[in-house]
């Protein structure tokens, strides 16, 4: 196995949420360190609490580090953040929100300094994390503000790769936020990601409609004809194999 394993930052998320359970169950398999060098940002107190309370869990040996410069290859590294937080599973609190934000800020600093190759974020509680240092509706917006660039949120399964045009806004605002240029930009981003990250030589992208039955020719909404279809046509002219709008009720998987 190459010594040049990717360094993957992992934030604990809300210490009262599911993040630590997912992290511990993932790294209970010792083979994980053969694939990457994990760097977890979080509370040792929380890690030890969940190690004791989760049934049938193999012990996870952590290498404790105070900074990214103390991590070791082949080890499950834990950079200490928010260790004074009171652990109350399932309970939202400002204290837990601060611990989640502290881990996230520390990881993003190291990512920005090119000390990490990628970042995985455990879930946060979007209400309790709000503070003067964190005024965002989610990880996506925070990372965009800290690292620059236009974010693309994707949802992935074994069969499906789905990019979102709008993110983290009320349903009542979607039609106002939807523009032809935004759709074209998202299609360009999605095509680039599918090629670079998923190895798809030339992806074909179905663009889903906003309204039921793709608007039924304007009877159920005009966004398909006035915004979505022109955007799809423009993207196709740019060499993107996009088609639609397709009614989401017609979306089928192999």
List where the protein language model places each region.
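A generic structural signal for well-ordered coil/turn residues at beta-strand boundaries
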Residues: 72, 150, 159-161, 201
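Active-site glycine-rich loop that binds ribose-phosphate moieties when present
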Residues: 142-145, 149, 171-193
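Contiguous, glycine/small-aliphatic-enriched amphipathic segments in soluble metabolic enzymes
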Residues: 1-138, 181-251
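Short, acidic/small-residue loops that bind anionic groups at enzyme active sites
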Residues: 131-157
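A glycine/threonine-rich phosphate-anchoring loop and its flanking beta-alpha core
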Residues: 153-178
């Amino acid at each position: 196995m190459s010594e040049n394993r990717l360094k993957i930052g992992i934030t604990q998320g809300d210490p009262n949420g599911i993040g630590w359970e997912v992290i511990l169950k993932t790294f209970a398999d010792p083979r994980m360190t053969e694939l990457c060098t994990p760097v977890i940002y979080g509370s040792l107190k929380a890690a030890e609490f969940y190690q004791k309370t989760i049934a049938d869990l193999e012990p996870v040996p952590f290498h404790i580090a105070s900074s990214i410069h103390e991590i070791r290859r082949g080890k499950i590294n834990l950079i200490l953040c928010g260790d004074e937080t009171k652990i109350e599973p399932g309970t939202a609190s400002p204290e837990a929100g601060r611990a989640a934000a502290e881990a996230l800020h520390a990881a993003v600093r190291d990512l920005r300094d090119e000390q990490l190759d990628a970042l995985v974020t455990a879930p946060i509680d979007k209400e309790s994390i709000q503070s003067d240092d964190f005024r965002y509706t989610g990880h996506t917006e925070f990372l965009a503000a800290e690292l620059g660039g236009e974010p693309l949120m994707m949802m992935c399964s074994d069969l499906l790769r789905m990019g979102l045009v709008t993110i983290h806004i009320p349903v009542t605002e979607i039609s106002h936020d939807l523009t032809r240029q935004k759709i074209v930009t998202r299609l360009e981003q999605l095509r680039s990601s599918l090629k670079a990250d998923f190895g798809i030589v030339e992806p074909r992208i179905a663009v889903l409609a906003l309204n039921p039955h793709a608007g039924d020719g304007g009877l159920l909404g005009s966004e398909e004809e006035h915004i979505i279809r022109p955007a799809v046509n423009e993207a196709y002219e740019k060499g993107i194999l996009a088609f639609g709008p397709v009614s989401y009720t017609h979306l089928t998987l192999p």
